[in-house]
Regions:
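C-terminal motif of bacterial Sec signal peptides marking the signal peptidase cleavage site
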Residues: 15-16
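Aromatic-lined substrate-binding rim segments of carbohydrate-active enzymes
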Residues: 64-136, 184-205, 264-267
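Boundary/entry segment of secreted carbohydrate-active catalytic domains
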Residues: 26-88
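An active-site-proximal structural segment forming one wall of the substrate-binding cleft
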Residues: 108-124, 143-170, 194, 230-233, ...
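Acidic-and-aromatic substrate-binding clefts and catalytic sites of carbohydrate-active enzymes
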Residues: 53-67, 74, 86-93, 100-112, ...
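Substrate-binding cleft of secreted/luminal carbohydrate-active enzymes
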Residues: 82, 249-257, 276-354
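Active-site cleft segment of glycoside hydrolase catalytic domains centered on the general acid/base Glu
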Residues: 138-168, 173-201, 206-208, 257-266, ...
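Aromatic-lined carbohydrate-recognition surfaces of secreted/lumenal glycan-active proteins
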Residues: 127-148, 170-176, 188-230, 247-253, ...
């Protein structure tokens, strides 16, 4: 019945357009007039990563004024949680962490990004999750104990220094893994357990990736995992993380669109089995382009949001708002993606006339 009514409405709108003088230059249109009868519904995004210590995304060189404006745009869109993707990567760190400076060959940072982000999260009544330090070497070389030791000391320092902020509400275990790095669960387990013990059981989150056709490894000749292999292997991995990880948010961009729903269903099934909330990590950049990386096409993002809704995801984070969805981004396409998102979900767009 709803489909019939939608079809009739679209027909009426099109007839209305046709009835007007096609040469009337004063005629204006709305995107709603051209929405298809079975346009996907999708689910909303409630969180974003903050990718300021970046792996492969260019920096926008923002100061606190620009970040303040962007937090406001996030809040206006409905985002209530921000996740620092990592405290540092290799030589670059997000704040002058004494525990890292004392043992690692890192550069002393000019800005305390952790304090800045926490103050902004406080201001806009958002939850902040602190992401761990990624050495970029120890865990890649198999020295898991060194990676664990660094992060346990960092957790103690960070909680003592920043734990008073009302927005400090969780931890992100930053090292990203797939089927090829199963031993990483040792880091997840030890670091996650310590973070929860120190902070009074604040939640922990992980965002691994699916070993699919769009991973660098598979595009270089490795074999993509099947859905059944993914379920078997991650059942084993997650069985070692029960009670340590609270939010499981698989990245959604490494598999093809026609495969994604089946993986999401498995992810939800596994999360439920081990008492975790199942989020999805909407990649708001486009892996299908020859350039790394540009904002995703709205149709692709909406398709992924609809699959996540149908699979019953408990929440959705994106990687990441500030570059790929923000009206403040250096990419003009990102602002248009923000416009389409607000328009689709009936959110007042305070940034339309930017």
């Amino acid at each position: 019945m709803n489909r019939i009514l939608s079809t009739i409405l679209v027909a009426i709108l099109l007839m209305s357009c046709a009835s007007k003088n096609s040469n009337d230059k004063s005629t204006t249109f709305t995107n709603e007039q051209f929405k298809t009868a079975e346009c996907p519904q999708g689910m909303k995004i409630n969180a974003t990563f903050l990718d300021e210590i970046s792996w492969d995304i260019p920096h926008q060189n923002w100061g606190v004024e620009e970040w303040d404006q962007d937090f406001r745009a996030m809040k206006d869109m409905g985002i209530n949680t921000v996740v620092l993707i990592r405290a540092g990567l290799g030589r670059w760190i997000a704040a002058p962490f004494e525990s890292i400076l004392a043992t690692e060959d890192v550069y002393y940072p000019p800005v305390d990004l952790v304090e800045m982000f926490l103050c902004l999260a406080d201001k806009y009544d958002m939850a902040f999750y602190f992401g761990m330090y990624d050495s970029g070497k120890y865990w890649h070389e198999g020295d898991y104990l060194k990676e664990i030791d660094l992060n346990i000391k960092l957790i103690d320092e960070v909680w003592a220094k920043y734990g008073h902020h009302k927005s400090f509400q969780g931890w992100y275990l930053s090292q990203e893994v797939s089927r090829r790095t199963k031993n990483m669960t040792k880091i997840y387990a030890e670091v996650g357990r310590h973070a929860k013990e120190v902070s009074g059981n604040l939640p922990t989150m992980v965002s691994p990736y699916i070993h699919g056709v769009k991973t660098d490894q598979v595009m270089s000749g490795d074999t993509a995992t099947t859905v059944s292999e993914h379920e078997y292997e991650w059942n084993e991995i997650l069985s070692n993380l029960e009670g340590v990880v609270d939010i499981l948010a698989f990245q959604d961009g490494q598999v093809d669109y026609h495969e994604l729903y089946d993986y999401l269903v498995v992810n939800k099934k596994l999360a439920d089995k081990y008492g975790m909330k199942c989020w999805t990590n909407f990649e708001s950049f486009d892996r299908d382009m020859p350039i790394r990386f540009l904002p995703i096409k709205w149709e692709k993002l909406l398709l992924k949001m609809e699959m996540a809704r149908k699979a019953g995801m408990d929440g959705a984070i994106t990687f990441e708002f500030s570059h790929f969805m923000s009206p403040n981004s250096e990419y003009s396409q990102a602002g248009h993606l923000y416009d389409r998102y607000c328009e689709h979900f009936g959110i007042e767009n305070k940034w339309k006339n930017r």
